Every structure is written in C-alpha cells, then in structure tokens.
Regions:
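A general boundary/transition motif marking the beginning of the first structured unit of a protein
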Residues: 2, 41, 151-155
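Exposed alpha-helical structural elements
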Residues: 6-9, 137-138, 159-162
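N-terminal regulatory/effector-sensing and dimerization cores
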Residues: 28-141
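An amphipathic alpha-helical interaction segment
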Residues: 124-134, 148-189
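Generic surface-pattern signal
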Residues: 12, 16-19, 136, 144, ...
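Short Lys/Arg-enriched alpha/beta "domain-start" segment
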Residues: 1-30
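Bulky hydrophobic/aromatic packing residues
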Residues: 11-15, 34, 51, 64-65, ...
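A solvent-exposed, charged loop/short amphipathic helix patch at secondary-structure junctions
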Residues: 142-148
Length: 189
C-alpha cells in the first residue's frame, strides 16, 4: 500500500515509479519510459489544475490518500477502471465517462488499481484553496452536500469536457495562460 498525504508526496510517488519530470508549456509532465506512460499537469496544483494521464500501474496497487485540503475532482475517463472507497463496504467504481470525486474530510480514501491495466483520463481539480483565494463563498455544508450529490456520480457535463479540451489546446503561455486558466476555473466552478 502506498500512502499519500500531499500533492508533493504524489509527485514523489511518480518519481519512485521511474517517472522523469520534464517541463512542458504551461506546466510539467512525468514520463515513464518503462511503462510507456505519462502524466501531464497544467495550472496550480494547490488551486485549480488540469491533468492528462495515460498510465499503466506495473502491479496491483492500493493508494491510501489522506490530504488535509478538501477538493473536487472531475475525471474524463477514456479507458480503465478504479475502485475507490473510504470504507470497503461502500465502494465506487470509476470507469469510462465523466466521473466526480469529492474529498470532504481528512478521513483516508483508498483507490485500488489493477496492475497492467491502462488508465487514460483527463481531470479537472478544484482545491479548497482555489475557492478561498478567489473569494468564492461556500455555504457551511457545501462539501458534505457536494459529496452527497455528485460524489461517485457518472455525470453528463459536456461543458466540462469542452473546458478541458480548450485548456489542452490553448496556445497562450506564461502569465497570460495563468490568467486565462484561472478564468476557466472560475467558469467551471
């Protein structure tokens, strides 16, 4: 089992799997030559970010995540499945399509991924800090309500797919890209 408490630990985990960090326009990526895999990031991983992954775990893996900051993740999955749970008797299966995950407390969250399975997905991630930095007021029960309504749901959200595609294809760089991406985060939130 792998335990991850922060974004930095997640990035170090990629390195432990043989990932080589490379700079990319408006972000960075990890390439995994042995697995012919990659994970690409845009934006502020502690605020609003986007990711593109084409990754094959070399062996069966259980990841125990216990982040201190709450977040919403929206995955646009093209291939592969992941089993997720906070309690084994309440599992969620994330598969092809638009999936949503709400991490609303410091309770450990587990993801079980079969080895040798190719995972291809894009993601949009909204950390709690993003809402605070942009003065987006969240009512007291926002995180609990979000978890009760969209957590684990297969969503029909073509506008989110469109936002991801536009991020991926954007030709802006530097501060112009950062400002543009923040605007897209605000639009999506």
């Amino acid at each position: 089992m792998v335990t991850i408490h922060s974004i930095e630990e997640m990035l170090n985990y990629y390195i432990s799997l043989g990932g080589l960090r490379k700079d990319a326009v408006n972000g960075f990526r990890y390439v995994f030559p042995r697995q012919h895999s990659k994970v690409r990031f845009w934006g502020d991983l502690h605020g609003f970010s986007a990711a593109d992954a084409d990754f094959t775990y070399p062996k069966d893996t259980i990841i125990r995540s216990q982040f201190s900051q709450r977040y919403v993740g929206i995955g646009l999955s093209e291939q592969g499945t992941v089993e997720a749970y906070t309690q084994r008797d309440q599992t969620i299966h994330f598969g092809e399509g638009v999936n949503c995950f709400v991490f609303d407390s410091p309770v450990p969250f587990f993801m079980k991924v079969p080895g040798g399975q190719r995972l291809r997905f894009q993601g949009l991630y909204f950390q709690e800090q993003f809402f605070a930095e942009n003065n987006i007021p969240l009512y007291d029960s926002f995180w609990r309500d979000a978890k009760n309504t969209i957590h684990g749901a297969d969503l029909h959200a073509p506008e989110l797919v469109s936002i991801y595609r536009r991020i991926e294809q954007c030709r802006l760089t530097g501060l112009a890209f950062d400002t543009w991406l923040k605007g897209f985060g605000l639009e999506a939130a």
